[in-house]
Amino acid sequence: MSEYSESVQFIDLKAQQELIRQKLDTAIANVLDHGQYIMGPEVKSFESDLREFTGAKYALTCANGTDALSLVLMAWDIGPGDAVFVPSFTYVASAEAPAQLGATPFFVDVCEHSFNIDPISLKQAIADCRKTGLKPRVVVVVDLFGQPADIDSISDLARSEGIKILVDGAQSFGGTSKGRPVGSLGDATTTSFFPAKPLGCYGDGGAIFTSCDEDSEIINSLRLHGKGSQKYDNVRIGMNSRLDTLQAAILIEKLKLFPRELALRAEAAQRYNSLLQDKCQVPILDKDHTSAWAQYTLVLPDRDKIQSALKASSVPSVVYYPIPLSNQTGYKQYPKVSSGTLTSERLSRQVLSLPMHPYLEFLNQQKIADLVVRNL
């Protein structure tokens, strides 16, 4: 095969920036001209765009995706004595947020094909939890790698148990479940605008989506130090968590490009599938789901060998995530489902994420797939 058509990037922010650089420069210059760097007009404009994109009644931006999780849990008065169910196979923020509030993360296993929370494991965890004296309050439904979880099955279970659903859409913003956009699922949804996310800014940022009037009012107060109707009358303990105006201005322009980029990501994923699906375990989408394709992740019994081969050919790859949360030093003290988290543990040994972005060239995908297949 010929040489790579370009240096392979795991995530190519430069290619995107080149497409809209003039628009970004103008948007940033406008903020510099008006000088409202905190909660300027672009923040409200971007929140309006997010509401339109998701169909949520409210969209409230904040400083980052982790704060978004914390703000929702704070609005729901989650704290000591409360159990928050979290998949063991995910990024730490999903468990960090409840733990910081004094609640107990309760770890649940995931489905092998989707990497998302397993409703059967969740049902067992709720039963286990009730025996401990903890109060089951919330399930954090993480949409890992871009695909929404089985929200209907989880919703049926959660409703029957009186448990709220917090969708962690940090990786799935732009995806859909049965035609419903991420942002309109669960009691509340959060997302992250970290630069590497499908919709990312050039710093940190996050957002919360809800259709509950009361939750929206409380979250708006919490993100601004717990302020009341008067600026210096703080009616609750809050935090300082705001999306700055420059990032909002950037995100307004990037959101305009986002639908096209989602389509390009889906095309790139389909090309990978056509090259690899007969050779190894590729990502499987649930029926009537679309993915934001934050990552393209294989399950490979000899993962380390293949990653080494890719590295030797200057092809980047990443393991998301090498240690289940329930096994990590800071979190193994917390309870996990009695049936165990065996799928999470095995996936941590076998997953490998390949380069994925909207501007990935087919020639490079062919070379990457060839390296994977030759080293199986």
Placement of each model-derived feature along the sequence:
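Structured binding elements
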Residues: G102
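Active-site phosphate-binding strand-loop segment of PLP-dependent enzymes
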Residues: H113-C201, A207-F209, S353
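Phosphate-binding glycine-rich loop
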Residues: G35-A83, A97-A99, F107-D109, K131, ...
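Short beta->alpha connector loops at strand-helix junctions that form conserved
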Residues: S88, F107-C111, Y321
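Pyridoxal 5′-phosphate
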Residues: L19, I78, P136, R265
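PLP-dependent aminotransferase class I/II
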Residues: S2-E3, K14, T26, V43-S48, ...
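N-terminal "arm"/small-domain region of PLP-dependent enzymes with the aminotransferase-like
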Residues: M1-Q36, P41
